[in-house]
Amino acid sequence: MHVSHPRTRRSLLLAASAALAVTGALLTSPPAKAADSPAPAEVSPHAAQTIDDIGASGAWWVNDLQHFSPAVRARVARLLFSEGGLELSSYRYNIGGGGTAVTTPARAAEDFLNPDGSYDWSRDEGGRTFLEYAARYGVKDLIGFVNSAPSRWTTNGKSCGGLLKAENEADFAGYIADVTDHFARQGVRLDYISPFNEPDNSFADCGQEGMPVPVDQRDDIVRALGAEQRARHRKTGIIADESSRTTQFNSELPQWISQPGTARYVSRLAHHTYNDPDDGELGKVHETSASVGKKSWATEICCFGKGTTGWNQEYDPTIDNALLMSRIIYKDFASSHDSAFQWWVALASGYGSDPSTRNDEGWNDGLIYYDPDYAADGNQKLYFTKRYYALGQYSKFVRPGSVAHNVTGAPNGVEVSTYDRNGQWVVVVNNHNTTGTALNLHFNSGTPVHASKAVRTSATENWANVAKPSVRHGTLSTTLAARSVTTYVLDRRGHGSTALAGAWQGQQSGKCLTADASGAAISTCTGGADQSWSYDAEGA
């Protein structure tokens, strides 16, 4: 469905929707429930992990969008990066390998290398354009990721199916560092580099760029790039290894990161979830990451459908697929305790037979879609999916620095995640049920006093401001709309940390303060009846 050009920055999401402290809080007890009221779900008082970012990648739709009008390109940037749009806090820029022998040219990015080793920085116009937009909008984490090294350094001379030659690892590291330096001179700082993507896949069919990287070479590449960046006094971090499946991540990561001198160069661990892992497997991701003392990121997923979160060809712009996406985000944050979620491609053209209707010819890989025949028919309309709005439920509210708290006891068919953000609670709720569902949610710390916002995405609503839930005695109570994703923002009492750790502890000062109308006096005392206790929200 075409969305008309928004008139104001503030109304981007609404326009698209129209087209389609002083004292710490003491622990509280939930109020007695009425006979027909469900038992409350419980928010843990213990912090789980701090969220770094939520975002998407610029592969490879930017190659098409460079041929769209400047007005459309600017609008897409606003829809993705601005406060009135998704307000993404990360963006993945594809550092190209040149596309040599790739049979689908649109699925490869130009590299900057000339045959003589010099650089042509005018290449990759589309990629550079949207990377610069992301920087201009202040996206927190800009990530450069590599699918293949330039073909001159691969074993088969292609940008697909060939390994990086061992003798060219330093050359490759120098190339990536040169790209990083160039963008820094342009005022665009790449915060992280991912030197290989899905290294377990050979991409030998050459349908896209890709480079297999054996387990015993991954540490060599990380060390080469890390040493090169350090020699140039760059603070760009390295993320790795972006395995396609969590099973590979769990078994292979410990092998390469344990090699001497490697771990110090790794800022974040990265995995994909194309094996549709269950909670147990996701829990192993957390264990693997914790065992090496690193935070993990979920850096790519797409293309699930037909009622499951497993790989399936389907195009579904409806709330059904949006709920599947939201379930994946929920599990990444709640089960593997990832600190970031990054969707595959922000835009795509593979909507199949009809951009407004579910069909089996397209793919669920984008948030927004455009006409694959734009060059012939001149159609530059944008088509929105419910996934766009569902991602916004997280990206706009679960901002960098938000602290996740696990939730237990949610009703059947309901998934609840909670985040402590700047003196407020953010609650994102997925209701997979086909009927309205009652929810009571009790907070064991940082007691909320009232709800300040409620936004819902459902079958009939894209981005709707809805009635706020009641909040009483630290418990949120509401009825969730059928088949919906809803975010609640709750103001709470006090602004200290909500994490409670360790045992209650106190320290006796040996002094007492006596005050009356004539003044105050400090005296030595031993406590006893004169002693009172207060709770410091910093915990033990």
Where are these regions (language model features)?
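C-terminal beta-strand-rich structural cap/linker in extracellular carbohydrate-active enzymes
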Residues: 469-496
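Aromatic/acidic polysaccharide-binding cleft in carbohydrate-active enzymes
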Residues: 298-390, 405-410
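Active-site cleft segment of glycoside hydrolase catalytic domains centered on the general acid/base Glu
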Residues: 152-259, 278-289
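Extracellular glycan-recognition/adhesion modules and their associated mucin-like linkers
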Residues: 495-518, 532-540
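Glycoside hydrolase catalytic-domain groove-lining segments
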Residues: 120-129, 237-238, 264-310
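N-terminal catalytic cores of secreted or lumenal carbohydrate-active enzymes
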Residues: 37-190, 195, 213-215, 219, ...
